[in-house]
Amino acid sequence: MNAPLTPIVVQYLYVHEPEEGFYYPTARAGRSAAQVAQRYLECALAQVASLAYREIPCDLILAMNVTDRSVLGRAGTDLLAKIEELGATVLPTPYTHRPKPGTEIYVSSRYVLDAIMTSTEGIDPGRQVWLTDLDCVWADPARVFASAPPAPEIGCVFIDYPPDWDTVGFEAHGRTRNGIGELAAAMGAAGGAPPWVGGELLTGTAGPLRELVAACEELDAQLAAGDKTLPNEEQILSLAGAVGRIHFADLSAVARRITTGPRSHAAHVTGFEQIGLWHLPAEKGLSLRRTAQQVRRGHTRRLRRDLSDPARTAKRFNVGDTGPLRRLRDDGWIAAQRIRSITPRPAGG
């Protein structure tokens, strides 16, 4: 009997060109392309650690467009080296599925389409590929891997936005679930408010994933013929599902976007023990960064202990109850990062 094929976990990071315009709405993002890349490499390292330190049987890939690592600065280069040291392969991936020229918000969001193409090239057609946002933590990898839908379905996370909730904030079309439904109806589909496909997780085997990219390309061409555009990946993925080109399977029972911390007006998180993949966008400058710093410095004893215990894992990443002292520490951490963000840095830092 053949042994099951090892899954592939793919993260992807587009590093902006030095003169490229981009916008991130948070102070923690930094002022330069190198600083933005460093913040996201911290997330990537934390995610790799959440798998590598448990010796989870999977292959780890980080798709990147960088060929000259010096553009990452010293800190970024060190982070990337540590990611490789933990067993991840850096996969050169040019960005060819960009939004229209001039887009500065969500400019990198469609990079997942290129990561699909490079990570699935030449692999066994039966291997399951898991593409995740960088700011994710694998709390229960086995639970997530066991949820893989049968081919040709594509696993994802449906986000339960209200039908008229504007998730994009610019451009004229497809900004809401109803807006995606209107575009789908114009293409001959039933219309209505289709599910919104989140970008934090996509999973499938090579053939269906590559068909997903082809479907997005064809839909982009149809939209462009009518002088319409969808700037981010969640919009075009949702449209692909709405018109019936791709059948998406909702994995929100095992993977979810979790809002953390009072600064994000987060509600108390319940049922996190059943969620195997946590998407933690509010933790970029907090627990994910602290974890990356510990890995980078070799101070991993507590991290390994935390990852071996679900309750400790939840506390580390601010998913479980943390108490007022932890919140006070987080507030101090944020203040320190904001001060640092306006302090001049040495060249190459």
Question: What residue ranges belong to the model's regions?
Answer:
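GT-A fold catalytic core of metal-dependent nucleotide-sugar glycosyltransferases
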Residues: P92, V112-D166
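A short acidic, often aromatic-flanked loop/helix-cap motif at beta-alpha or helix-coil junctions
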Residues: Y95-G102, P163-D164, A255-T259
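A short, conserved beta-to-alpha structural element at the edge of catalytic cores
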Residues: G155-L183
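A short, glycine-/small-residue-rich helix N-cap motif at loop->alpha-helix starts
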Residues: T103-V112
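A structural signal for short, well-ordered beta-strand segments and their strand-loop junctions
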Residues: V9-V10, I61-A63, V90-P92, Q128-D133, ...
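Catalytic core and acceptor-binding pocket of nucleotide-sugar-dependent glycosyltransferases
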Residues: E182-E283
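Long, low-complexity C-terminal extensions of enzymes
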Residues: S264-G349
